[in-house]
Amino acid sequence: MKTDNTKTMPNTKTTTGNKTTEEGYRMPGNKTTDKWTSPAQTEFHCFFVDQLKDIYWAEKHLKKGLKKMSKAATSPKLRDAFEKHYNEGDKQIAELETIFGLLGEKPETKRCEAMAGLLEEADGMISDTQKNSFVRDAGLILAAQKVEHYEIA
């Protein structure tokens, strides 16, 4: 049987305060509750927190990418759209931090390969196009649409 800080198996003891019984598992990071959970719930909690870390990284890095995209845009309307999305990121990051807190977890990031790839592609659009050109703006719009589709998914 495996024993670690995120999953404790029945009939095992840990020194972290996550005591177990035959009935089930204590939720990791939630040492103040007397509620017991099933192995599936614990596994889901770990999975869910892992996905939150991924999303948290994506939101934080998207803000940096949007700042670059805004500076690279020629059209004032496009620049304004990037700035608006940039400002919305603060709210989304705060909401994620609230969710981490409700789960008894510290907000942590885990590199999101999908967002990293999309932001790298946006950087390529900037470096591969002429400054102050319609083509660059079109490339930035395309990159932003891809990011938006990822966020929806």
PLM region descriptions:
Residues 2-153:
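Amphipathic alpha-helical hairpins
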